[in-house]
From Swiss-Prot:
Residues 1-63 form a transit peptide. Acylhydrolase that catalyzes the hydrolysis of phosphatidylcholine at the sn-1 position. Has a strong galactolipase activity toward monogalactosyldiacylglycerol (MGDG) and digalactosyldiacylglycerol (DGDG). Low triacylglycerol (TAG) lipase activity. Plays a role in plant growth and in leaf senescence. It comes from the Eukaryota. It catalyses: a 1,2-diacyl-3-O-[alpha-D-galactosyl-(1->6)-beta-D-galactosyl]-sn-glycerol + H2O = acyl-3-O-[alpha-D-galactosyl-(1->6)-beta-D-galactosyl]-sn-glycerol + a fatty acid + H(+); a 1,2-diacyl-3-O-(beta-D-galactosyl)-sn-glycerol + H2O = an acyl-3-O-(beta-D-galactosyl)-sn-glycerol + a fatty acid + H(+). The keyword Transferase does not apply. The keyword Hydrolase applies. GO terms for cellular component: chloroplast stroma; plastoglobule. This is Phospholipase A1-Ialpha2, chloroplastic.
Length: 484
């Protein structure tokens, strides 16, 4: 597949300056036995200085200054993920990205690593609970009730959050097949949930956390929505539609389409989310709050659309108080909109942390050719198509595992989470009881994920086959548009 990065290529293509996007590169290599690459150079965009509260848990961070951050060599081994010395309740705003995660990525701050993992596990719940059995009464719905979802999916500390609403999305897809099949394709399906932190967890988190999680692409109509690669105005604000702010039409359709013609009259994904978030914000309006949106693959696109929607409508603004932070944790997410979408998100204070794998082709889509890297010629001349280029939003935390070549594994959410937690220290104490064999770390990691992905492959082979058949029914024009 032409879009997949060749693992035998040098890493140089990934080290080019991605300005104006802030890029933070974390070297990571898995091989048998483990081999570590030479230190790579990092380049970060300007951002505000980080809080001094986080100083005790940041190791080897560069000295802050008013001048642009210098180019420096990353350490050969990532930072240790040992216990943090500052409680989350004191620094949660920094962890949520108030300073664009400055000095928290390289080396990776233990608290940030912990929170990314926690939100990633909340997203994985959507996959574990999604019913794909056509013979089940809960087909395309969640297997469990809201009260038992987190416990049934064996999430750590399920009592920390209370699920308040399930979210459904309706793909607006019509292709040249039978009317009955088209009706099934337009059927709403469960894509995630809204949850609020419990009273007991508020003390540890430092605020009331409203969380929305989205799963990635699973069903055939969702695959087709991903291939509707054309930019269209979002038009979220009723009085100021901002026609220059454009997003990918397939993601927008999934976010805004409803099932109003059915006997149930289900609202769109957007209406469900805005209504529930507004209700929760009104319920906890006297408390310190945060809005955290997390998603994998297609779900990260929905999370970014929701974040922009909330901020554009001003739902997170409070009179006489500071704005409620809106943060997106994106796992393996594609590009969502154009340059104006990125600029507007930054103006509104939407924070996005993108966790990506350099070998994951999904993170290169859409806009394989025309994107933020080919918008300006020679660093000076704006190209005519720059307004139509897809652009990533936010700060990028890159996991580099070139030796993982399984196409299923490189995009798998659990692989992302596992790799994020396979951090190694610069040095290990001689007296440490953890005398593990370093040559077996990568072997165990690949073995575990390989067995898991082979099981999933056998379980879902029918769905992949159907997806391929449907994709081949697309016109050559649509396929051409997706490449660009």
């Amino acid at each position: 597949m032409a879009l997949i990065q060749n693992p035998n290529m040098k890493h140089a293509p990934f080290l080019r300056n991605r300005s104006p996007q802030q890029t933070l590169f974390i070297p990571y290599t898995l091989s048998l036995p483990i081999s570590y690459q030479n230190p790579k150079r990092l380049k970060t965009a300007n951002s505000s200085s980080s809080s001094s509260l986080l100083a005790p848990v940041i190791l080897n961070s560069p000295v802050a200054s008013s001048s642009p951050p210098p180019i420096y060599c990353a350490p050969k081994f990532p930072c240790s993920s040992g216990a943090a010395t500052v409680p989350l309740s004191r620094v949660w705003r920094e962890i949520q990205g108030c300073n664009n995660w400055k000095d928290l990525i390289e080396p990776l701050n233990p608290l940030l690593q912990q929170e990314i993992t926690r939100y990633g596990n909340l997203v994985s719940t959507c996959y574990k609970a999604f019913d794909l059995d056509p013979n089940s009464k809960r087909y395309l719905n969640c297997k469990y009730g809201k009260q038992t979802l987190l416990k049934e999916t064996e999430i750590d500390q399920p009592e920390d959050y209370q699920v308040t609403k399930y979210i459904y999305a309706t793909p607006d897809i019509n292709i040249n097949i039978s009317p009955i099949q088209n009706e099934m394709n337009r059927r709403a399906r469960w894509v995630g949930y809204v949850a609020a932190s419990s009273d007991d967890s508020v003390k540890r988190l430092g605020r009331r956390d409203i969380v929305v999680t989205f799963r990635g692409t699973v069903t055939n109509p969702e695959w087709l929505a991903n291939f509707m690669s054309s930019l269209t105005p979002a038009r979220f604000h009723p009085h100021n539609p901002r026609l220059d702010v454009k997003v990918e039409s397939g993601f927008l359709s999934l976010y805004t389409s409803d099932e109003s013609e059915s006997k149930f009259g289900l609202e769109s994904c957007r209406q469900q989310l805005l209504s529930e978030i507004s209700r929760l914000m009104n319920k906890y309006k006297g408390e310190e709050m945060s809005i955290t949106l997390a998603g994998h693959s297609m779900g990260s696109s929905l999370a970014q659309l929701l974040a922009y929607d909330i901020a554009e409508l001003g739902l997170n603004r409070r009179i006489g108080k500071g704005d409620i932070p809106v943060t997106v944790f994106s796992f393996a997410g594609p590009r969502v909109g154009n340059l104006e979408f990125k600029k507007r998100c930054e103006e509104l204070g939407v924070k996005v942390l993108r966790i990506t794998n350099v070998n994951d082709p999904v993170t290169k889509l859409p806009g394989v050719l025309f994107n933020e890297n080919f918008r300006v010629l020679g660093g000076f001349y704006e190209l005519p198509w720059s307004c139509s280029c897809y652009v990533h939003v936010g700060v990028e935390l890159t996991l580099d595992f070139f030796d993982v070549q399984n196409i299923s594994c490189v995009h798998d959410l659990q692989t992302y989470i596992d790799l994020l937690n396979q951090r190694r220290t610069n040095s290990r104490s001689v007296d440490s009881d953890e005398d593990e064999d370093s040559d077996n770390v990568a072997l165990e990691f690949l073995k575990t994920n390989g067995e898991k992905m082979m099981f999933l492959k056998r379980q879902r082979m029918m769905y992949w086959s159907n997806a391929v058949d449907l994709l081949f029914s697309f016109s050559n024009h649509m396929s051409y548009c997706n490449i660009f």
